[in-house]
């Protein structure tokens, strides 16, 4: 489960931000995680909960995960199909099965609220 190491990296980033801004506690962390990022949101949340219990800066902080959409572009007609879940079987416009993914691979620290 590589999400644990991602959360550890996030906590280091939060510690750096807290130090730079002279803050002592993280209240809320908002992440943007794309469905093609390779990150399982539930595992990331689990890692956050487990590791935050051991970290004074992040203990009790809320984690908000926003899932970004992927646009699947048809290679034949160019139509775009947005999805946050599974890849569509085919283009809704022309029934082509070769669809190219655009975006959806984000793993972004979007917002942090600190005290």
Language-model-detected regions and their locations in the chain:
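Intrinsically disordered, low-complexity, mixed-charge
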Residues: 1, 78-79
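Long, charged N-terminal interaction/targeting segments
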Residues: 1-61, 66
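Immediate flanking context of iron-sulfur cluster ligation sites
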Residues: 64-72, 82-84
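Cys/His-enriched microdomains
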Residues: 72, 89, 107
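Short cysteine-rich clusters marking metal-coordination/redox-active sites
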Residues: 74-77, 91-94
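Cys/His-rich microdomains that often coordinate metals
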Residues: 80-81, 98
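Short Cys/His-rich "knuckle" micro-motifs
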Residues: 84-87, 101-105
